[in-house]
């Protein structure tokens, strides 16, 4: 009898031991994946600086569109030294400009969007087709009528869809014209303000992942007049504004003005707006003019490339530094012998890169063997 009782206790102890071991195994099996594969948060999404942690356009690298004059000229260049210089421009993601007057603009935009999607990168474009563009300066052009412009904006919005994208809205649409004497109650000004607002509202309604930045010039406008211009131009529908497009003002100065402008807009009830700065040619702050053009940023051989596109900025409301103006393209016939605006200008391209490398502004990238 005693023997049976002892055996029963032994079996009971063994059974309990197996049960405990089994429970521990199950418990460990459930915890192991968390220990071996801890969930890693995306550091970009933790940055409070950007204001909105769900900005998809800034969660990916910028897309390099290769259908550019810089890329084409670099591929064709036979001189190894010049090829190396031009490559510094050609290999840097830069905003692609569209005016929407020619049919090929739509097909080019579609290729750009598809290319960016395939590489899971963010495209950057510039809308540059507003009627009476550039207020009669070197880059005059654009759509002939407001109706035509709106049709193009509708098409562009439809092509972009839900693609995460950065959109620069109409460089020099306000600053050039206001400096040339446009008044806030002029018919042309009112039409322009209405068209810019149309751009903002169209994208706000149909393109949830598009970040729009309305151009307000360099720092040549006073804060109050600049504020009235962007408010009239529908900045309430956009992420914010862009400054320094094609200009040579240094980044610290551009940021100082822009941070003050953010406060100016807040005081006018617009909430917090953000901005981007064109650093494509601002490596040297306001270089001395080298020709007789009426503005110093026109084919200036004293200028240098600025820092390459990045979201690592120095100011709380600066979303990014971008290359918006294409370095190496002519600003226009600023001096004798200068090519037309938008043409490849080898001498300017060479000078911009040389000065940037000399001053350590950009890292010199090696040209691939098969380029």
Predicted regions and their residues:
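N-terminal carbohydrate-binding/catalytic regions of secreted carbohydrate-active enzymes
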Residues: 58-155, 159, 325-352, 356-366
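Surface-exposed substrate-engagement region within the catalytic domains
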Residues: 65-90, 219-349
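Bacterial Sec-dependent N-terminal signal peptides
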Residues: 20-53
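Short, ordered loop/turn segments at secondary-structure junctions
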Residues: 128, 172, 217-218, 246
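Bacterial N-terminal signal peptides that target proteins for export
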Residues: 1-10
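Bacterial N-terminal signal peptides
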Residues: 9-19
């Amino acid at each position: 009898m005693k023997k049976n009782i002892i055996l029963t206790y032994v079996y009971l102890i063994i059974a309990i031991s197996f049960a405990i071991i089994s429970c521990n195994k199950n418990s460990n099996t459930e915890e192991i994946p968390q220990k071996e594969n801890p969930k890693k948060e995306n550091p970009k999404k933790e940055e409070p600086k950007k204001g909105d942690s769900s900005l998809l356009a800034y969660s990916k690298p910028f897309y390099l569109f290769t259908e550019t004059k810089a890329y084409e000229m670099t591929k064709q260049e036979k001189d190894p030294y010049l090829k190396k210089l031009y490559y510094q421009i050609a290999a840097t993601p830069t905003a692609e400009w569209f005016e929407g007057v020619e049919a090929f603009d739509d097909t080019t935009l579609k290729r750009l969007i598809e290319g960016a999607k395939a590489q899971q990168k963010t495209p950057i474009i510039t809308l540059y087709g507003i009627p009476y563009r550039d207020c009669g300066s070197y880059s005059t052009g654009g759509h002939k009528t407001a109706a035509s412009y709106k049709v193009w904006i509708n098409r562009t919005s439809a092509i972009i869809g839900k693609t995460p994208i950065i959109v620069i809205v109409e460089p020099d649409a306000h600053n050039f014209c206001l400096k040339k004497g446009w008044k806030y109650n002029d018919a042309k000004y009112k039409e322009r303000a209405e068209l810019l607002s149309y751009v903002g509202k169209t994208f706000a309604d149909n393109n949830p992942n598009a970040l729009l930045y309305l151009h307000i010039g360099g720092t040549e406008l006073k804060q109050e007049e600049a504020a009235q211009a962007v408010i009239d131009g529908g900045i309430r529908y956009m992420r914010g504004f862009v400054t320094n497009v094609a200009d040579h003002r240094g980044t610290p100065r551009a940021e100082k003005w822009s941070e003050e402008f953010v406060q100016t807009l807040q005081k006018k009830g617009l909430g917090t707006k953000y901005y981007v700065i064109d650093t494509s040619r601002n490596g040297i702050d306001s270089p001395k003019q080298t020709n007789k053009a009426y503005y110093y940023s026109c084919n200036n051989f004293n200028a240098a490339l600025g820092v390459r596109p990045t979201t690592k900025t120095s100011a709380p409301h600066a979303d990014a530094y971008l290359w918006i103006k294409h370095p190496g393209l002519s600003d226009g016939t600023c001096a004798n012998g200068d090519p037309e605006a938008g043409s490849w200008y080898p001498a300017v391209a060479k000078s911009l890169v040389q000065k940037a490398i000399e001053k350590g502004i950009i890292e010199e990238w090696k040209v691939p063997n098969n380029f």
